[in-house]
């Protein structure tokens, strides 16, 4: 043992020599090896701390000088040792929970809760993937145990003893079948006993349950007597009867267009009479076309007047020409011309209807200041 300790001390001088000395340790002394590794890590920590103190004493002005001279490999070994310790604790926790699996599931202890709290404490120091994987493995194990523990819960909420309920119900209504063992309740229960049983149960049940008011509908007629049903019309029978009697539906009569034509001719003659009256009253003054046909109070009546005046022009009772202001005027033919032979336009007369919109009608009424229609209504 002394030789082995001497070889370990020599290993502290160099990295290669230390590695060779560790290999020569036999497998039976594994625990001693682990203890010596922990002592070596502690010695490294002391060495790092001493180096830091020395640098801070020599150069107190430069605060970051001590940290800059620390070997990164030493810090790496310290972190590796910390992570190794966390993994060891996780494995020990998983092993303990697996060994106590039956006690955790079948008893009402808080072992699973305590194990979860311990895992939460370990997880605060986890910084690498290997330790996080062990934490996930423990959580999977804990969730399985929690599921099994929930299945073993004994809940009496859904338990219902029908036999005991029937016995209590019989005693409540005054029928105790258990007093006479020789009596068969199914064979000796007559209709009167059954009726009395249900009446008692109904009376006690209604006293505990508030009864809702009856609902009445107010739809339909308020008359006391019922409405008489209308007889259904048999359309098919009526059609057959009409075919048997030879009755045919009334045909549409042809539209009588002659009546409309006569009404148009009468209106044209009436307007022509008004125009000739004006010509006789003012023989030398032609009448303005717009002042004659425009009705300031009715646009539809104005359109009708234009339509009727076109027939007067077509039949040669008057003509339209433009005055010096380029506005249309109406003149009688028999005043300016002696006969039809002297009228160069007699054989080339044409009928035309001007277009007039509602806005044009308003503008003409405002421009000519027409306040009263020259063609009065006949109705």
Curated annotation (Swiss-Prot):
> What keywords would UniProt list here?
Chromosome, Coiled coil, Cytoplasm, DNA damage, DNA recombination, DNA repair, Nucleus, Repressor, Telomere, Transcription, Transcription regulation
According to the record's subunit comment, the protein's assembly and interactions are: Component of the SMC5-SMC6 complex which consists at least of SMC5, SMC6, NSMCE2, NSMCE1, NSMCE4A or EID3 and NSMCE3. NSMCE1, NSMCE4A or EID3 and NSMCE3 probably form a subcomplex that bridges the head domains of the SMC5:SMC6 heterodimer. Homodimer, and heterodimer with EID2. Interacts with the C-terminal region of CREBBP.
- Organism (species): Bos taurus
Main location (coarse class)? nucleus
Q: Which GO terms describe its biological process?
A: DNA recombination; DNA repair
- Which InterPro entries does the entry mention? Nse4/EID (IPR027786), Nse4_C (IPR014854), Nse4_Nse3-bd (IPR029225)
Q: Where are the transmembrane segments?
A: none
Name used for this protein in its record: EP300-interacting inhibitor of differentiation 3
Q: What does this protein do?
A: Tissue-specific component of the SMC5-SMC6 complex, a complex involved in repair of DNA double-strand breaks by homologous recombination. The complex may promote sister chromatid homologous recombination by recruiting the SMC1-SMC3 cohesin complex to double-strand breaks. The complex is required for telomere maintenance via recombination and mediates sumoylation of shelterin complex (telosome) components. Acts as a repressor of nuclear receptor-dependent transcription possibly by interfering with CREBBP-dependent coactivation. May function as a coinhibitor of other CREBBP/EP300-dependent transcription factors.
GO cellular component terms attached to this protein's record: chromosome, telomeric region; cytoplasm; nucleus; Smc5-Smc6 complex
Q: Which Pfam families match?
A: Nse4-Nse3_bdg, Nse4_C
Lineage at the top is: Eukaryota, Metazoa, Chordata, Craniata, Vertebrata
Where in this chain does the entry annotate a coiled-coil region? 32-58
Compartment(s) where it occurs, according to its Swiss-Prot or TrEMBL record: Nucleus; Cytoplasm; Chromosome, Telomere
Q: Does the keyword Nucleus apply?
A: yes
């Amino acid at each position: 043992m002394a030789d082995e300790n001497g070889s370990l001390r020599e290993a502290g001088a160099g990295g290669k020599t230390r590695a060779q000395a560790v290999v020569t340790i036999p497998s039976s002394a594994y625990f001693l090896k682990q203890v010596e590794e922990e002592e070596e890590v502690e010695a490294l920590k002391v060495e790092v701390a001493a180096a830091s103190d020395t640098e801070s004493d020599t150069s107190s002005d430069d605060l970051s000088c001590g940290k800059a001279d620390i070997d990164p490999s030493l810090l790496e070994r310290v972190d590796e040792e910390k992570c190794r310790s966390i993994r060891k604790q996780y494995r020990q926790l998983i092993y303990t929970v697996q060994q106590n699996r039956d006690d955790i599931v079948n008893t009402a202890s808080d072992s699973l809760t305590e194990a979860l709290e311990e895992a939460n404490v370990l997880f605060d120091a986890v910084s690498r993937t290997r330790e996080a994987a062990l934490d996930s493995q423990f959580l999977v194990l804990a969730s399985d145990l929690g599921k099994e523990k929930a299945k073993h819960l004994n809940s009496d909420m859904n338990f219902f003893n029908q036999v005991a309920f029937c016995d209590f119900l019989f005693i409540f209504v005054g029928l105790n079948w258990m007093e006479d063992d020789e009596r068969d309740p199914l064979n000796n229960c007559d209709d009167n006993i059954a009726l009395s049983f249900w009446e008692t149960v109904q009376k006690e049940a209604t006293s505990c349950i508030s009864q809702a008011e009856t609902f009445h509908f107010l739809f339909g007629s308020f008359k006391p007597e019922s409405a008489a049903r209308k007889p259904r019309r048999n359309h098919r029978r009526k059609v057959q009867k009409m075919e048997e009697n030879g009755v045919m539906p009334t045909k549409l009569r042809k539209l009588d267009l002659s009546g409309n034509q006569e009404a148009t001719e009468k209106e044209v003659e009436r307007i022509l009479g008004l125009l000739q009256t004006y010509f006789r009253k003012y023989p030398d003054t032609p009448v303005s076309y717009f002042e004659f046909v425009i009705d300031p109070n009715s646009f539809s009546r104005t359109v009708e007047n234009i339509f009727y005046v076109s027939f007067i022009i077509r039949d040669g009772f008057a003509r339209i020409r433009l005055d010096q202001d380029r506005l249309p005027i109406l003149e009688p033919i028999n005043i300016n011309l002696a006969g039809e032979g002297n009228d160069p336009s007699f054989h080339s007369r044409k009928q035309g209807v001007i277009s007039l919109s509602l806005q044009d009608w308003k503008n003409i009424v405002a421009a000519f200041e027409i306040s009263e229609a020259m063609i009065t209504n006949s109705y």
